[in-house]
Amino acid sequence: MAYAALASARLGHRSAAIFGADKIAAGAAEIDLLRSAGVEVHIVPLEQGPIFENVEKDHGRVQTCIEPGEPVPVVDVPNVWRAAPAWLVVPVSNETGPEWAAAIPPDARLVLGWQGLLRKLVAGTETGRKAPTRGPLVDRADLIGVSRGDLGKGTGLDELNKLLRPGTRLVLTDGIHGGLAFEATTRGPANEVTYDSIPSRQVDSTGAGDVFLAALVAAWLDRGAPTEEPGPTSADLRWAAAAGALAVEGVGLPGVPDRAAVIARLADIDHEGQKRHGSDCSRSEDRPDRH
């Protein structure tokens, strides 16, 4: 949740965050960083929060569950928070139970990061993977984000579509291969939009998916898109991909980019594309005509 909340704030949106935290986590420097960025923080006291150990290896990240933590109960929040146009639910250890689906105001967009509901967690063992299933949060969600790496091999769009209520949009990310978005319908996936990845120099991938999702919501809100729109658009996805690419180039929460950084990265990419196009045209014009 911390990455999504900070990304929302740094991308220019008023942001509030509800955290379940034990005494140690509640006093962490990351909480101060959120507050300094303008995020309004509500900490729900827990006896034990989740703890993971991440180790990057040649074949990818290996994550070990040190402590799975405990559920975060639904809490009362200020009325101004309840008026927010979008709520991001991004659990890390299945800590947001089904009761959270009913707690989100009915006229707000519910955006779900599916990853945290798909982890099989046993203290002292490597994090496992659960098959995606339906549930109150999935049924309530207007937009769901998930990585191919969080799904079993061979999980196809038709299979995912069957788990979603008609009208829900799902974004399926695939790292350097880009990704796609589609709208769930009774006839199968519809309104599919693909996007390319943004080149990056990866240092730390922690939280990149949450930053991507928060940036996607920010783009959606910036143009006043209605909830019934079969988005997100290719421009929304490109913006989110740039934010996610920047996030992996830093270390930890301080690496979350701001709006200016995303704009600059996209401008650099456009400039490089124009240079390549111009070079290709020049080479074409230099070739002698052959008759």
List the predicted regions and their residue ranges.
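Short, charged, surface-exposed secondary-structure boundary motifs
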Residues: 52-53, 119-125, 202-207
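Conserved beta-alpha-beta core of the PfkB/ribokinase-like small-molecule kinase fold
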Residues: 86-161, 176-178, 184-185
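Short, flexible/disordered intra-domain loops and linkers
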Residues: 23, 120-128, 225-229
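Acidic, amphipathic alpha-helical patches
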Residues: 77, 134, 202
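Conserved phosphate-binding/catalytic region of the ribokinase-like
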Residues: 157-291
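Conserved N-terminal subdomain of the carbohydrate kinase-like
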Residues: 10-95, 100-112, 265-281, 287-291
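Histidine-anchored nucleotide/phosphate-binding helix
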Residues: 1-10
